[in-house]
Regions:
Chain A
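Glycine-rich anion-binding loops of enzyme active sites
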Residues: 23-27, 34, 67-150
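A generic local secondary-structure boundary/capping motif
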Residues: 7-9, 17-18, 89, 100-106, ...
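N-terminal glycine-rich phosphate/pyrophosphate-binding loops that anchor nucleotide-derived ligands
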Residues: 1-55, 59
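Glycine-/charge-enriched secondary-structure boundary and capping motifs
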Residues: 77-100, 105-113, 118-121, 179-180, ...
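Solvent-exposed alpha-helices and their adjacent loops that cap or buttress functional pockets
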Residues: 10-12, 20-23, 64, 105-110, ...
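Internal active-site segments that recognize and position negatively charged phosphoryl groups
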Residues: 133-142, 166-191
Length: 277, 277
């Protein structure tokens, strides 16, 4: 968050979620904005947009091992509001989450949709990006690249696009993992970029073996899959001798901090690592 | 919130704030969106916009007697982001509130800014709009119409515009009032409209005496002052024999529900009561 992140009060903006202790509970809070033409396609089904808006915020809670308490919506009226409401209904029911409040505005220009999700931590300390240690192993809950294929199918008007349109928030996996992980985050902007961020936050170097990363694309597009976002798998580290309590793939190991935060098959990857905001 | 308000999960949208019990605490949550050209003037000082965005949400918390815990910001980049940050810093420092998180997006079109404010109730049950009873007296914490004069001064480029640019959230008043009020809300959309909403929510009729309403405008503009918004005074009802624990003016009494929710000097007011979203 340019400019704002330098503000002493704005430290929370560097991470996806804020954690706030309140009485006997720890609250986990996240806010994301989707903009038409940037985060979703103009003309995309508003029901899918509603799904994505909610699911991506819940995914942030999943990465904190948090149980959702509800969401607040900042809704800019669009071309088919009833269809948005239908999708909102579907995603809220699917995750058993309440719409606690929000507001509606009319405005010209691309549709801007904001959502705040609120959860309670199921385990404390709440996992962050900053706990990976030398000797940990790096894990991911499932393949990357499915959303990339889904977007291409949607743009082509042909083929399976669910992974792009209706991402899943891995809440149950996050709850199961929270007591054991040394660090955790959801992969929203590309595996290489997000892994690099986690390594930087933890002051370590991540060494990832390309071939061990599960991908949803053909092998020829492995590199795209590792740099594409929107899959919302959980990326986490566990002490070296721990197995994952949920199905997951070990994709590398954590070293002491070297010259580069990320090594791919032993070398710093070149080019764009993912989707930079 | 058209469409959404009919959703069973969307009941919270009918009120300004959501209240959520969590452990030993009650959380109070509100989300408001400001749109350039609708809620603030194009070209208005971004520092003032930041102030208003935060203060209006904190005002919602004030009306619930809630103590702010922090805010989350959905920020669409504008023409002078450092100036926005300066105003944000100022308002957060003024109220001692933390920026917990949020995100930044770039988009064409008018600037859309969303803010979620989170607080903890200082008194339970948390005051709502729906508790006014026959025999209560109706109170307001201060004059209406100052923001109207401020807007006019700002548009004219001459005169005192602080009341419009930098509204105050009456947090201390809200905390002091919460244990005693039968209903409370902040006046954001015009006194007559908001009073009518409170009466409807409480299933009663409010009888307001025009002359007893404190106004910041000349007497000739009393009618404007009663219908204009943006002043963020607290409107509340107390049992008939109670005096207000904070400086406030008694402006009327509560009757059993009659044919109209609101009477002004004994008659239902005609015309537009305030700012309808």
């Amino acid at each position: 968050m340019r400019g704002l992140a330098t503000h002493p009060a704005a430290r929370g903006l560097a991470d996806d979620c804020a954690v706030l202790d309140l009485g006997s509970e720890s609250l986990v809070l996240t806010h994301d904005t989707l903009v038409e033409g940037i985060h979703f396609l103009p003309g995309q089904d508003p029901a899918d947009v509603a799904w994505k808006l909610v699911a991506t915020n819940l995914s942030d809670l999943a990465a904190k091992g948090a149980e959702p308490l509800g969401v607040l919506l900042g809704y800019q009226l669009g071309t088919d509001d009833p269809r948005f409401v239908a999708g909102l209904d579907e995603v809220l029911s699917h995750y058993g989450v309440s719409l606690l409040g929000g507001d509606t505005v009319g405005a010209a220009g691309p549709q801007v949709l904001g959502l705040t999700a609120l959860g309670r931590a199921t385990h404390r300390p709440v996992p962050s990006r900053a706990g990976s240690r030398h000797g940990d192993r790096i894990w991911i809950t499932g393949p990357v690249g499915a959303a990339l294929l889904g977007l291409e199918a949607l743009q082509a008007g042909d083929g399976e696009s669910t992974a792009y349109r209706r991402p899943q928030a891995l809440l149950a996996q996050g709850w199961a993992l929270a007591p054991f992980v040394t660090a955790m985050m959801d992969v929203s902007d590309g595996l290489l970029l997000d892994a690099s961020r986690m390594a930087l936050a933890s002051c370590v170097t991540f060494a990832i073996e390309q071939a061990s990363v599960p991908i949803a694309t053909p092998e020829a597009r492995r590199d795209d899959a590792l740099r594409w976002g929107d899959d919302y798998q959980l990326l986490f580290t566990l002490p070296g001798n721990h197995e994952s309590p949920v199905p997951a793939n070990c994709i590398g190991i954590v070293h002491e901090r070297g010259p580069a935060p990320l090594l791919l098959d032993g070398k710093p990857p070149s080019g764009k690592l993912g989707y930079e905001h």
